[in-house]
Every structure is written in C-alpha cells, then in structure tokens.
Amino acid sequence: MTISETSSNLKNTPPQWGRKFIQTIADLRLAIILLLLIAIFSISGTVIEQGQSLSFYQANYPEKPALFGFLTWKVLLLLGLNHVYSTWWYLSLLILFGSSLTACTFRRQLPALKAARNWQFYQQSRQFQKLALSAELETGSLESLTPLLEKKGYKVFLENNSLYARKGLIGKIGPIIVHAAMLIILAGAIWGALTGFFAQEMVASGDSFQVKNIIEAGPLSKNSLPKDWGIKVNRFWIDYSPKGDIEQFYSDLSVIDNQGQEIDRKTIQVNQPLHHKGVTFYQTSWGIAGVKVQVNNSPILQLPMASLDTKGNGQIWGTWIPTKTDLSEGVSLLTRDLQGTVIVYDAQGDLTSAVREGMTIPINGVNLKIVELVGSTGLQIKADPGVPIVYLGFALLMMGVVMSYFSHSQIWALQSGDRFYIGGKTNRAQVSFEREIIDTIERLKLK
C-alpha cells in the first residue's frame, strides 16, 4: 500500500474520539442522570425564592444556623440559586441533555424505524425457527390468511408463496416524536431564559408607570421590554370577609401609549393576570401608599404612609401630620388595612381616637378629616417568549407518548408444498399478540 493510499484511508475513516464521544452522549444512563439533575435543580428553583433582594436572602438564609448545615445566603448567591433557570450551568445541562437526545435519536430511534420499514419475505421454513411465536400447519393458504389479517388491521404484502404483514408502525414513530418534542421543550426553555425578563412594581392607586424595576433579564431580552407603552393603575381595592379577613384583591389596569391613550384595560386578581404583547402582569401583593387628609379648610393633602416594623405582629402602616404651621406639634396616623379605620396618636404616643374614612375629629385645636386611604398594588411582571415553544413541545410530547403505546406487530407466512408456516413478533403487548396469532391459526384450520 502506498503512502497516498494510506493517507486517503485515514481521511475517509471517522476519528475514533468523535465516535466515542457520540456513543457516550447517546448513552441512556447519561440521559437519565442529566434528566435527574435538571429535575433536582428545577425543584430547587421552585423551592428557593427567585429574584429576591440581597436583604431577603440574608434574612431567610442566615449563616448561623445554615439551612441543611450548608445552605447560606453566600452559598446560594455563589451558585446562582437565586436565578437558577438562567445560570450558565443550568443552561449547559439543558444543552447537554438535548445533545444526548439528538444523538440517541440518530443512533437508535431512526435506525429502528428504518429497520421496521425495510422488511423482507421469509423464503425458507428454517427462518421461522428464529421467531418466538411460530407454527407449522398442514392446512392453510395465503389466500385465506390475507383477509383474516386485513380484518385485524394489518397491511399485507404478497410475493409468490410468501406473505408479510405489519401493523402499528406508528409505534416506531412515537419515540422519535417524543425525542423531538423534548428537544423543542428544551429549546423553548433556553430561548425563554435568554430573551425573557422578570420585574416587580409597587404602584399607588391612580399612578402610571413603565416597567423599570427589572429583577432579572436575559442577555437577549432587549426586544421583550416594553418601550412604547406603560400601565396605569386606575383603582386598587380589597374585598374583605365579615370577619375582616382578605378574600381577594383587585387592580383595575389600563395599558396606555406614550401619549396616555388607553390601548387595553382589564381588572386583574390573583391567578387572573393581564397579558399584552407577550408581557404578563400578575397580582401578587398589596400595600398602603398613603392617606388623603384635610386640615380645617385646607386643600386635600396626600401623605405617604410607610410600613412599620412590628416585630412579627402583622403589618402596620403609619405617617405623621403636623397640626401647627411651624411643625412643632402633630399626630401620628396608623392603619392595618384598607377597611377605612385609622388610629390617631398624639405627640406623647397616647391613643386619641379611631377614625373612619370621611370623619372629622378635633385635635390640637384643628379639625382633621380623614378623606381616603390610598392603596398600592404589588405587580409581578414577566415576559417569556419561550412559552409558546414549550407548549408546542408538550403537545407533541403527549401525541408522541400516545403513539408509542401502539404495538408494532409483524407476521410472516410461507406456503411450501403441503406445509404452511406462520409466525410473528411484536415489541409490546405480547400476551395480546399471542392470542391474536392463536385465533388466526384456529380460523385457518377451519378453512
């Protein structure tokens, strides 16, 4: 052999490392391990609050005592567990799992489908000995067998004195559809992580805003962010039970353009969000933004109310209002909810009175009227362009799973002199297939 021939043969031989790599990533055990890792980290992303502030993680995941003995806020932030679904290692797991599925599809599923379609007739009786289910009959003919199999849903092929029949080829296509569907789901998840964003806003009733408080955004999320429109909170209110418990809270939202013109409008509540141009606004929390008051005959003033630290004894909002022009005296206003009751304390911290909205009380020589409590709505804002792709993948996945349950059954028959040979095999539902073959043989004997 010449040097040029050797060189040519080396060029035409696939690299050994390439084939070994494909064999490795196509290994079912590797795919299962990757799937388990993805499931574990996905669960961690559900259990651990995503996209919260540093102070939140410091308060809930302190260094002493550490959760499970190791999970502190430092470890959590170092590993990226505060934004699991967009970390490089999570996306790498998805890509590796997708590569494993692709390799498995081309190495196993497609060849299996090709083998199922490239059938051949049995020409010799000894070929039936390889089948787990076969019989040799003294009676029977291809002409009588053909209608029996066609009634059972088989597609029959004849050639001289040989017969081949099959049904359930869709069962071989099903696993390929399942693999393709999972790849589509992975692609949707990756695309969503790269192009989506997550934001939070706390907006007072009557105010307008554009999405600015971005908690988390993918590197390609620029086109997903709202640019030429914003949101106006027309009204926020809470429904209370007779016992004073919160039943539901609502936000009447309008989508407005840059000129303030209304484009869309919807009243949202928990689990009933507003959707606009791929961005979803969820009702998640509430607060008290301020209180409107009037001192004597002054214009109505809106004072901001701040959430106070109650050491775990529930939420309270408070503000201070001067009762003298030189600000030397004033009163504190406290409230727990939007039911309209305000508690008034004097400068010494003594309880003065409890006032309802619309009521006027004399205090420190002035008439103080509580006009209205102003609520604020907590909105969670998300955009995930990968969701439609994921939904498509799940639809195909369900279809592929159903297709995979169909048994791929094959039957061969041979007319050889005064002998008739019949046999078959299936990839699942073996008992049902055996009954089908036995029934077919019994019917052949009767003809």
Curated annotation (Swiss-Prot):
TM ranges: 28-48, 87-107, 173-193
| Keywords, sorted A to Z | Cytochrome c-type biogenesis, Membrane, Thylakoid, Transmembrane, Transmembrane helix
**Assigned protein family:** Belongs to the Ccs1/CcsB family.
- Subunit organization: May interact with CcsA.
> What's the protein's topology in the membrane?
Multi-pass membrane protein
The protein's job, in short, is:
Required during biogenesis of c-type cytochromes (cytochrome c6 and cytochrome f) at the step of heme attachment.
Q: Where in the cell is it found?
A: Cellular thylakoid membrane
Name of this chain's protein = Cytochrome c biogenesis protein CcsB
Q: Which domain of life is it from?
A: Bacteria
- Which GO cellular component term is one of those annotated? plasma membrane-derived thylakoid membrane
Pfam families associated with the record: ResB
Cited PANTHER family: CYTOCHROME C BIOGENESIS PROTEIN CCS1, CHLOROPLASTIC
GO biological process terms, alphabetically, are: cytochrome complex assembly
InterPro entries, alphabetically? Cyt_c_bgen_Ccs1/CcsB/ResB, ResB-like_domain
Broad class of where this protein is predominantly found: membrane
At the highest ranks, the source species' classification is: Bacteria, Bacillati, Cyanobacteriota, Cyanophyceae, Oscillatoriophycideae
